[in-house]
Amino acid sequence: MMKMSKEYSTISKIYGPLMIVEGVKGVAYGEVVEIETESGEKRKGQVLDARENMAIVQVFEGTRDLDIKTTSVRFTGETLKVPVSMDMLGRIFNGIGKPIDGGPEIIPEDRRDVHGAPLNPVARAYPRDFIQTGISAIDGMNTLVRGQKLPIFSGSGLPHNQLAAQIARQAKVLGEEESFAVVFAAMGITYEEANFFKKSFEETGAIERAVLFLNLADDPAIERIITPRMALTVAEYLAFDYDMHVLVILTDMTNYCEALREISAAREEVPGRRGYPGYMYTDLATIYERAGRIRGRKGSITQMPILTMPDDDITHPIPDLTGYITEGQIVLSRELHRKGIYPPIDVLPSLSRLMKDGIGKGKTREDHPQLAQQLYAAYAEGRSLRDLVAVVGEEALSETDKKYLEFADRFEREFVAQGYYEDRSIEETLDLGWELLSILPESELKRVKKEMIMKYHPKYRKRSS
């Protein structure tokens, strides 16, 4: 039953993105507010805090040019809802869901609460199916699984935007009968970055199966709190109403957390670590936990949030708390970036906790689990020997040690590195892994069973063919 709307002109204070309305009754937390100026301009807001006879309202379009005396506030009695429709595929919206691509307004099939419906943990299905991104360092070493939440930890100046666009363009589920979509939400990005994403999606045709939400750096910070929730609400609609497999890419979650800190400071809340609000963990969980699968439903939501680590500090509160909630991380390396390697994914600190359940026979290939373990071990050994060479010189190494050094160099140049438009199948990725392992003596392949070596090692594969 819809509550009656109430209008007030009793604004007592405006500061930052917030306004305080006095003398209100029956106002609820999260309620949508319509703000009207003397000139008739309308803006939207949401109740952040409701107390006896007083409400704190956050204004989505910002409070600039609002006058306390001539501005009226109407409490609608509804929570914030986003209009959803299959017609949203192929469209670009701003951070609060208004079309910015010159196309018509969306005629909604339904309106959904941006906070989503709580998902009973018992109703969740365990993620088990492989998603192919076409990027070897992810598919081969840190596999993405349907329903997983796998963040990318980046740093300022690293090519995470290019990586996000490449994943959005190339990601697919194997099997023609499966329908796949990408929901892309960018928060606090520059005009240059927004144009890059628009151009990348439109020129490659990826826009046809995508929904884009773009919140710009000069948009009000408060919009950044809404943007990822808008995107996830649309993703839930596509996944659970239309049985689609949806990949949600959120960038940059650091900008989201900065907006959270800004609003918390405006509300004069007691700060937590480094000034971020104490409830940031819970707030991030309300976003990340909307990934997953539901028993009895075909659709799924897979999340790849991207965040830039301030000062490349992986112990910073944002990556630290994100790591607690999500199921692994893809870490970008400044050292690899300096070497000219794209994408600069450092596979050693990277991890996909659900990888073991999404690979192997019937999913990728039977040799995948053992091959990945052997590649990890060999690359780790090569990296360790690099440090040793810096101390004792290469002359002190054995022939086998030199092979490991060669392997580490070629692994970075040939396996990790690939072109921006290079889309490798999982078979190509695994075969490339075996080619690199052939550098090492067969006696060093201790993590791969003999029958796998006989079947997939290039030396034996060429003989059988």
UniProtKB/Swiss-Prot annotation:
Q: Which UniProt keywords apply?
A: ATP synthesis, Cell membrane, Hydrogen ion transport, Ion transport, Membrane, Transport
SUPFAM superfamilies to which the protein is assigned, alphabetical: C-terminal domain of alpha and beta subunits of F1 ATP synthase, P-loop containing nucleoside triphosphate hydrolases
Q: Which GO terms describe its molecular function?
A: ATP binding; proton-transporting ATP synthase activity, rotational mechanism
- Tell me any Pfam family this protein matches: ATP-synt_ab
Cellular localization per UniProt: Cell membrane
Instruction: Please give, as recorded in its UniProt entry, the membrane topology of this protein.
Output: Peripheral membrane protein
Keyword flag Membrane: yes
Q: Name one GO biological process term.
A: proton motive force-driven plasma membrane ATP synthesis
Q: Which Cys pairs does UniProt list as disulfide-bonded?
A: none
GO cellular component, as recorded = plasma membrane; proton-transporting two-sector ATPase complex, catalytic domain
Family of the protein in this entry: Belongs to the ATPase alpha/beta chains family.
Known function = Component of the A-type ATP synthase that produces ATP from ADP in the presence of a proton gradient across the membrane. The B chain is a regulatory subunit.
This protein's assembly is summarised as: Has multiple subunits with at least A(3), B(3), C, D, E, F, H, I and proteolipid K(x).
Which NCBIfam families has this protein been placed in?
ATP_syn_B_arch, PRK04196.1
This chain's protein is named A-type ATP synthase subunit B
Species name:
Pyrococcus horikoshii (strain ATCC 700860 / DSM 12428 / JCM 9974 / NBRC 100139 / OT-3)
